[in-house]
A protein has these predicted regions:
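Charged catalytic cores and adjacent phosphate/nucleic-acid-binding surfaces used
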Residues: 1-17, 22-24, 28, 47-62, ...
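Divalent metal-dependent hydrolysis catalytic cores, especially in the metallo-beta-lactamase
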Residues: 27-44, 100-103
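Glycine-rich, histidine-containing beta strand-loop boundary motifs that form or position
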Residues: 42, 106, 160
Length: 224
């Protein structure tokens, strides 16, 4: 670790069902924005990020957003893809075995597979952090998540939850540079959130992606 970098910890690519952002385009945009790393956290898949990581191993970090039977887990430095629909405990065990950094996606955002306070308290022993700032959340949700983290001795992650290129970098952390899950665990201790909540209109990117992918499937056309 050393110099301070700005990193968006929650990013979706075309690998997610509700995004059209290609990996190469995300890489170029991240570089343009001056982000220190590119972390891709697609829904229940690591296909795109593993492919991009082979091309840019010193810049791209593999993540995954895993839908469990309770809520979504945001995992960083994953080595093996986890399927959706498993229990949180199964996910935590498998992620711990990989040495991954474990955060919980958008607490209090109950309409988006967020987590309740009771659930977060139940799973505290397995967590490295929770997401305390998500650009697609309402401000009150982010403030509540940050308050919960502070009261329970947890560190926080922050991200744009980008589903379109224009969202990338809307939120994130400024923190010491890191190259492993263990270094990240140390870096988040002195991290600061940057950015602000996105307008509700960004949901357009997700809905457009879902619609276009549905049409392409019906026509038998592959997008990637």
């Amino acid at each position: 670790m050393g110099n301070i970098v700005r990193v968006d910890f929650h990013v979706h690519s075309i690998g997610s069902s509700d995004s059209l952002s290609k990996g190469e385009a995300l890489y170029r945009q991240a570089k343009k924005l001056g982000l220190g790393k590119l972390i891709i956290t697609d829904h229940n898949t690591t296909k795109t990020v593993f492919e991009l990581q082979k091309m840019y191993p010193d810049y791209v970090i593999a993540g995954e957003e895993i839908l469990t039977t309770k809520g979504e887990i945001l995992a960083i430095f994953v080595k093996e893809e986890l399927p959706k629909g498993i229990t949180p405990l199964e996910a935590f065990k498998r992620l711990k075995d990989q040495g991954a950094f474990i955060s919980l996606s958008h607490p209090y955002a109950y309409m988006r597979h967020g987590w309740t306070e009771a659930e977060m308290e139940e799973f505290l022993p397995y967590l490295d952090a929770i997401e305390i700032a998500n650009a697609r959340n309402l401000l009150d949700m982010n403030l509540s998540a940050a308050k919960f983290a502070a009261e329970h001795g947890l560190y926080g992650t922050a991200g744009s939850d980008a589903h379109g290129l224009r969202e990338l970098g809307a939120m994130g952390l400024s923190l010491p540079d890191f190259n492993s899950a263990d270094e990240l665990r140390e870096a988040v201790r002195s991290a600061e959130v940057f950015g602000k909540e996105s307008p509700l209109t960004v949901r357009y990117y997700s809905r457009k992606a879902v619609f276009l992918k549905m049409i392409h499937r019906k026509l038998g056309i592959r997008l990637y």
